[in-house]
Amino acid sequence: MSPAPTDIVEEFTRRDWQGDDVTGTVRVAMIGLGWWTRDEAIPAVEASEFCETTVVVSSSKEKAEGATALTESITHGLTYDEFHEGVAADAYDAVYVVTPNGLHLPYVETAAELGKAVLCEKPLEASVERAEKLVAACDRADVPLMVAYRMQTEPAVRRARELVEAGVIGEPVFVHGHMSQRLLDEVVPDPDQWRLDPELSGGATVMDIGLYPLNTARFVLDADPVRVRATARVDDEAFEAVGDEHVSFGVDFDDGTLAVCTASQSAYQLSHLRVTGTEGELEIEPAFYNRQKRGFRLSWGDQSADYDFEQVNQMTEEFDYFASRLLSDSDPAPDGDHALVDMRAMDAIYAAAERGTDVAVDAADSDSADSDSADAAAANHDADPDSDGT
């Protein structure tokens, strides 16, 4: 007999991933000192149970040392060169890499060589090829790699996955996901930014925010994409180089579920995820932005319920999960192989938008930024690793 919805959502924000015997502290080095690191990551770690920020790494010594004042636990401010040289390597146990997408690889490679656990922002890199190199570097060094899909530790998303798994909404049939924001008007009001440079970003909208409904659908369904179709449009010339200001894409999952996802970097800020099954539906709205009061609605049979629950900081949950897995000598998830599925799916989405046809995941053969061009971007001093992203 399947559990009732009231049983599954009891203690809605419970940390089902946390064991009773977890003790200790993981010391974290922040790689990249942009606004996300300063305003979100460092405060989230400061509020966590199992980790603390001890090292910050930035483009200049002055900036790095100045950032040591952000919290008392920070003891070292390093330049990127000093990080690569292994300076103060004994002062941290793990790194959080939050540079532009196309610069993740060199910092993860260094962290792996130093034997440090890695929490790397999503997407893994600006191209599939570089993402594969990143995963291989951690595998060779036998260091844990977790990719920062913070929705996977968001309680509303975890409860949604449990409800789907328990069959409360029957067999999943459709997923509708959406995420939009006004990038140039409200987030980063500068057209000369890394998100609009295809060599550094890999793409503006699918790679930055379209990834949220894609990966969250994967997690809730416990399924992987096998085929996609897509349409992309550009209205603002600032997006011409990347080619995807607004995007709509469809996904066929290996369990038979169909998804329709939309994303825009120039539309009203909004996010939602809806899963419709043969016997019911669940909806999370707003879904993806941190520090917003999440709504959760479940409809099943002839009943419906809106759940009011204590809100959490998604970043604090993510860091505590990562640290708790390291402290219990367990592999953190989602890992690099999981993230590579998204990289290949997004590659296929871009190819589908360009060709106007369905594309099988793993068979995109697209013209996305290759390793050489991304290496060149990394060598460009104008590509500031402190211009972080999520």
Swiss-Prot record:
Cellular localisation: Secreted
Protein task: NADP-dependent D-xylose dehydrogenase involved in the degradation of D-xylose, a major component of hemicelluloses such as xylan. Catalyzes the initial reaction in the xylose utilization pathway by oxydizing D-xylose into D-xylonolactone.
EC number: 1.1.1.424
Family the entry assigns: Belongs to the Gfo/Idh/MocA family.
Source species, domain of life: Archaea
Signal peptide bounds: 1-22
Subunit structure: Homotetramer.
Name of this chain's protein: D-xylose 1-dehydrogenase [NADP(+)] 1
Acyltransferase keyword on record: no
InterPro entries: Gfo/Idh/MocA-like_OxRdtase_N, Gfo/Idh/MocA_domain, GFO_IDH_MocA-like_dom, NAD(P)-bd_dom_sf, XacA-like
Residues annotated as transmembrane: none
Reactions catalysed according to its record: D-xylofuranose + NADP(+) = D-xylono-1,4-lactone + NADPH + H(+)
Region annotation (Disordered) ranges: 361-390
Keyword list, A-Z: NADP, Oxidoreductase, Plasmid, Secreted, Signal
Biased segments, Acidic residues type: 364-373
Stated induction or repression of this protein's expression: Transcriptionally up-regulated by both L-arabinose and D-xylose via the pentose-specific regulator XacR.
GO MF annotation terms: nucleotide binding; oxidoreductase activity
EC class (word): oxidoreductase
Gene3D superfamilies: Dihydrodipicolinate Reductase, domain 2 (3.30.360.10), NAD(P)-binding Rossmann-like Domain (3.40.50.720)
Description of the deletion phenotype: Impairs growth on D-xylose as sole energy and carbon substrate.
Record-level GO cellular component terms: extracellular region
Keyword NADP among record annotations: yes
